[in-house]
Every structure is written in structure tokens, then in C-alpha cells.
UniProtKB/Swiss-Prot annotation:
Domain of life assignment: Eukaryota
Listed Pfam families: F-box, LRR_At1g61320_AtMIF1
Record-given protein name: Putative F-box protein At1g49610
Natural source organism: Arabidopsis thaliana
Transmembrane segment boundaries: none
Residue ranges annotated for the F-box domain, each copy included: 25-73
InterPro entries given in the database record: F-box-like_dom_sf, F-box_AtFBL13-like, F-box_dom, F-box_plant, LRR_At1g61320_AtMIF1, LRR_dom_sf
Length: 385
């Protein structure tokens, strides 16, 4: 009898749990479609479609989500994408994300992009991890796209027609071909990001008065543009390998984040980098908000060790993204000594161990506060990546 009682109790508990789960599902299902669709748009489309088996209520909810996300990492085939687009009901697509790694799908890509454009897509993300794809001319003429990411490092980005992206405000490219021609067709562009554009010699943004944000990300082997003329930008993010960059005009700059890519101090050409980094510093001396990365600080420490002169900075806020070590401390202290108007200092470190963080506090108390008594606020941040 005791055993029967246990079974009855266990069965009752299972029924209660099941009832509770069903109530949770019902409460979610009672939400308006627009809320459900916003949530489904946060996951890859393949997973969003699976909710159609939950109940009759969910059968078509996914088909009007504002976003479609096709990621080849999830082994999507042509039939799946074609069927998904055929069943999709929304008249407008906010975000269309297409990442294709298999060249077998090459003949179908144009059709998928045309579908997104026919629904007046606003945010278009295209990434192709193979060669031979030639970006079609029709893509260069569009009035609905506001944000465009062309992750086609190995593909051709060479428009044979005029470029007309009349609504585009944010552009990210993995190719340095035809930059001037592309920008000429972006009258209201506000943000430009360039990845691995190592062959670009001169980046002239004089004719883009609305462009306020510029990001340049190089690789360990490449360098990025050699000369930058950007009189209108307010925010600059720069991470290149050899730092072969000369700023011809960044007179409107108010915020800058800079670092260098290299694996070891032994690999760099110290004398050349010292010269170019210090020239960079002088161009940044009037910027309000500065962020320096670990490798950049290492070069500054070399400069300090050789007694080279540093400019005086007008920065009100300074962020240091580095682990505190003997390789960066001299550069940090020199920058702080030359920043009499500094009000806020942020130390963003990769270390999360209590012992290391304790060392950071000691460093601040013994070194930074001694020379920077005028700082109003010091923040510590940590992360693992």
C-alpha cells in the first residue's frame, strides 16, 4: 500500500508539473503576435520555424517575424531556404542575415537577396566564405537599406554601375575595392567600418559630411589605409598591425580608440612604430575621450623608456584596455601625467582573479592617485574576452 501511495503521490506530482508547464505555454501563447514575433526574430530562422509544432496557435507565427536569419553553420540547404521564403508572409523585412559557407549554393544567392530587397529590407547582412561570387549590380541601387554589412572578403566588390544607397546610414565592408565610388552613392552615411582593407592607400572622406563614425580593423599581416582624411568624423576606432597610418585631417574628432595588432614585441619594428605612434598621439591630443589598448600602451612604454617627448592631452575621459604589467605601466603613467584635464579613468582588464584585481587597486593607490589627484572617478571593469 505504501508503494501504491508513493505511485499516487508521484503521479499527482507529475500531473501538477505538467499542468504548470501547460499553463506557462498558454500564458506565452496569449501574448500578441507582434511580441512573439519580436522574440522569435532573436534566434536563427531554422529554430523559429520549429515553434510551429507547439500548437495551432503557433503554426504561422514565425512567418511574419521581422527578421530572417540563415546561417550556413546550421547546415541549411537550398530547399529549406526556398521553402521558408515561399511561406514567409511579412510584407516588410527589418533584418535579413545570410551567411553562406558552401559554394554549392552560389547559383541561388541572387534570388535570395532579391527576395529580401522586394520586401524593403532595412538591415542587410551578407557573408560568403568562398570565392567567385560577384556582387550583382542590382544590389548597388536600393532605397530601403539603412544598414549594410558585406562580409565578402574573397568576392568581387566592384560596381559597374552608379551606386545609389539613398537611405544607407551604416556600412561595413571587407573589401577595399571602389571605396570612393561606393561612398559617392551614400549621401547620408553616418558610420563606416572597414575590415582587412590592406590595399587601400588613401581613405578620403572629405565628401561625406554626414559620416561621423569610422572603424578600421586590420589583421596581424595587413596594415589598412596609409593616409586618412576625415575632417567630419567624431568617433574613430583604429586597430591595425604596422600602424602605417598618417592622419591628414581629423579635426572634428572627439572620441578615439586605438590599438595595434602584433603577437610579440620581438616581431615589431620598434623605431618605426615609435615614430608613427607618437605622431598619432599628437593628432589625438585634443580628443575628449581616449581609449588605448594593451599593445599601444606597450609601444608608449618603449617611448617613455627612451625619453621621447609626449604631447599634453585635453582628454576628460581615458579608458585603458589592458592587463597591468611592467610592459604597460611606464606608458600609462606618462599619459596620465600629461592629462591635466582628466576627470574619469576606466581600467578595463582581462583579469578576473582576485589577486590580480588586488594588484590593480594597489597600482591605482600607489601610482595613479599620487600623480592624478584631480581625477574624480576611477572605474574597474573585467572580462574574459
Amino acid at each position: 500500500m505504501a508503494l501504491d501511495g508513493e505511485n499516487r503521490d508521484g503521479g499527482s506530482a507529475s500531473v501538477r508539473v505538467l499542468k504548470h508547464c501547460l499553463e506557462d505555454v498558454d500564458s506565452i501563447s496569449s501574448l500578441p503576435d507582434v511580441i512573439l514575433q519580436e522574440n522569435l526574430s532573436l534566434i536563427p530562422t531554422k529554430f523559429a520555424i520549429r515553434t510551429s509544432v507547439l500548437s495551432k496557435r503557433w503554426r504561422h507565427v514565425w512567418s511574419e517575424t521581422p527578421s530572417l536569419d540563415f546561417d550556413d553553420c546550421y547546415k541549411l540547404d537550398v530547399d529549406f531556404i526556398d521553402k521558408t521564403l515561399a511561406l514567409y508572409r511579412a510584407r516588410k523585412i527589418m533584418t535579413f542575415d545570410l551567411w553562406i559557407t558552401n559554394g554549392i549554393n552560389l547559383p541561388y544567392i541572387d534570388g535570395w537577396i532579391k527576395f529580401a530587397m522586394s520586401r524593403n529590407v532595412e538591415n542587410l547582412f551578407l557573408s560568403f566564405d568562398f570565392r567567385l561570387y560577384d556582387v550583382p549590380d542590382y544590389l548597388y541601387i536600393n532605397s530601403s537599406v539603412k544598414q549594410l554589412v558585406l562580409g565578402t572578403e574573397s568576392s568581387e566588390l566592384n560596381p559597374r554601375c552608379s551606386v545609389s544607397w539613398s537611405s544607407l546610414t551604416k556600412l561595413s565592408l571587407f573589401s577595399d575595392e571602389s571605396i570612393a565610388k561606393i561612398l559617392s552613392g551614400c549621401p547620408i552615411i553616418e558610420s563606416l567600418t572597414l575590415h582587412f582593407c590592406d590595399q587601400l592607400m588613401v581613405l578620403d572622406l572629405t565628401k561625406s559630411p554626414s559620416l561621423k563614425i569610422l572603424e578600421i580593423h586590420g589583421s596581424i599581416w595587413g596594415s589598412g589605409p596609409k593616409h586618412i582624411v576625415a575632417p567630419h568624423i567624431h568617433s574613430l576606432t583604429l586597430k591595425t598591425s604596422q600602424f602605417f597610418i598618417y592622419f591628414c585631417d581629423i579635426s572634428s574628432l572627439t572620441e578615439a580608440k586605438v590599438d595595434i595588432c602584433f603577437c610579440s614585441l620581438k616581431e615589431i619594428k620598434a623605431n618605426f612604430l615609435l615614430d608613427t605612434v607618437l605622431k598619432c598621439l599628437y593628432k589625438l591630443q585634443n580628443v575628449d575621450k581616449l581609449t588605448f589598448g594593451a599593445n599601444f600602451l606597450k609601444i608608449l612604454s618603449l617611448a617613455e623608456g627612451r625619453g621621447l617627448p609626449f604631447p599634453m592631452f585635453k582628454a576628460k575621459a581615458l579608458t585603458l584596455e589592458t592587463t597591468i604589467s611592467k610592459y604597460v605601466i611606464p606608458g600609462i603613467l606618462r599619459v596620465l601625467q600629461n592629462s591635466p584635464e582628466l576627470k574619469k579613468l576606466t581600467l578595463h582588464t582581462m583579469d578576473r582573479e582576485a589577486r590580480t584585481m588586488s594588484f590593480h587597486f594597489e597600482f591605482v593607490e600607489s601610482e595613479i592617485l599620487t600623480i592624478c589627484f584631480y581625477i574624480n572617478e576611477i572605474l574597474f571593469c573585467s572580462s574574459t574576452g
